[in-house]
């Protein structure tokens, strides 16, 4: 099959690369190309395969976390480091079709469509790592432990499915852990991010009072997608939110603590909950002059947290039950995420550029491996 990869032109012969393209991601040149991948062998008689399945990736998408991995791989290739590989695959969300099953697999069948189950932090099987299932969804073929995928319903299309797992599992966990009351006022920061979008849509489905904070202009269609949430725009790089009339909230969801934590804390009510699942500057090249990452307000922040009995919660992905719940609540008429663009394998640069360089992007960019 044809698969998209970051390619090392110093190590991979030109004849092995089709549709070579270059794009810039925050100052790093990333070279993408299409390579041939053969179906891996899978011996169902081998006991080592008993609890595993072989999956053909039908479509995949990238998350913010993949950006740093892509940039790091490209930097290694560009600097000709000895540890650089000929190709580097990427992508952590996918939908795939099971093509082979091991003898010990009972709940999954050949032909089933599945998505990754990134359960964390609790182990479900000895020797099977928790957390993100793969960083190489673009490889096209994946051999995975049976616990690391879940089947999806027919009414979830491939494009939503390829964008679903990490955002849905993370948002489901964050909402569960905040013990939200029906009267709580909720703020979601960086609201165009994929995780924030999942959070907003899930909260609205339950009837909560949601305010979404953004630094971008939204179209009417985009505002309609999150209605009746109140969308408030602030200037990008604003050092303090004191000059805007935000008010107070009982719960604040924030995907980027290094950008927003210091400004969030003063806007929490007594016994308020702040929860975060990540940070923006996962690589030094991601840092911008307008980022407010001051540490000299830390003492004031902790004083406010102590005086007001605040809860500061860190969240990493979620449990299997969190993902099962998100799948069970999925409504094709009210999807939790928009699909911004769908491209095929021969549009690798467009896929990466749209995913990471377009501030106007609203939702996920999906690459399909289906004809």
Descriptions of predicted regions:
Residues 84, 92, 117-190:
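NAD(P)H dinucleotide-binding glycine-rich loop of Rossmann-like/cofactor-binding domains
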Residues 162-238:
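Mid-domain Rossmann-like dinucleotide-binding core that forms the NAD(H)/NADP(H) cofactor-binding site
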Residues 43-61, 74-123:
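Glycine-rich beta-strand-centered segment in the early N-terminal region that forms part
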Residues 115, 252-253:
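N-terminal Rossmann-like NAD(P) cofactor-binding module of classical short-chain dehydrogenase/reductase
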Residues 173, 319-371:
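C-terminal hydrophobic helical "lid"/dimerization subdomain
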Residues 206-208, 259-336, 368-371:
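Glycine-rich phosphate-binding loop and adjacent beta-alpha segment
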Residues 237-247:
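Short amphipathic alpha-helix with an adjacent loop that forms part of the alpha/beta core around
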């Amino acid at each position: 099959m044809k698969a998209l990869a970051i390619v090392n032109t110093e190590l991979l012969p030109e004849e092995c690369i089709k549709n070579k393209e270059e794009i810039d991601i925050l100052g790093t040149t990333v070279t993408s190309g299409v390579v041939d991948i053969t179906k891996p062998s899978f011996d169902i008689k081998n006991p080592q395969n008993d609890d595993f399945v072989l999956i053909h990736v039908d479509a995949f998408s990238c998350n913010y976390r993949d950006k740093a991995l892509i940039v790091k791989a490209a930097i290694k290739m560009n600097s000709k480091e000895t540890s650089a590989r000929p190709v580097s695959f990427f992508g952590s969300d996918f939908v795939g079709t099971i093509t082979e099953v091991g003898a010990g697999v009972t709940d999954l069948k050949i032909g089933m469509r599945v998505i990754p189950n990134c359960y964390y932090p609790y182990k479900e099987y000895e020797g099977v790592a928790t957390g993100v299932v793969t960083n190489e969804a673009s490889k096209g073929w994946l051999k995975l432990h049976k616990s690391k995928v879940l089947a999806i319903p027919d009414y979830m299309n491939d494009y939503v499915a390829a964008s679903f797992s990490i955002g849905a599992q993370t948002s489901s966990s964050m909402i569960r852990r905040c013990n939200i009351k029906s009267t709580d006022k909720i703020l979601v920061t960086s609201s165009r991010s994929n995780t924030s979008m999942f959070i907003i849509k899930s909260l609205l489905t339950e009837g909560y009072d949601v305010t979404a904070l953004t630094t971008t202009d939204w179209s009417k269609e985009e505002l309609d997608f999150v209605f009746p949430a109140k969308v408030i725009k602030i200037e990008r790089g604003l050092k303090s939110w004191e000059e805007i009339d935000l008010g107070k909230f009982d719960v604040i969801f924030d995907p980027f603590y290094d950008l927003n934590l210091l400004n969030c804390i003063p806007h929490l009510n007594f016994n308020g909950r702040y929860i975060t699942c990540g940070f923006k500057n996962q690589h030094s090249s991601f840092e911008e002059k307008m980022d407010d990452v001051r540490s000299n307000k830390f003492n004031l922040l902790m004083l406010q947290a102590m005086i007001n009995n605040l809860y500061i919660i860190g969240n990493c992905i979620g449990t299997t039950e969190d993902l099962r719940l998100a799948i069970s609540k999925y409504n094709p008429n009210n999807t939790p995420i928009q699909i911004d663009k769908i491209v095929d394998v021969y549009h690798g640069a467009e896929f990466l550029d749209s995913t990471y360089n377009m501030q106007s992007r609203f939702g996920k960019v999906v690459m399909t491996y289906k004809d």
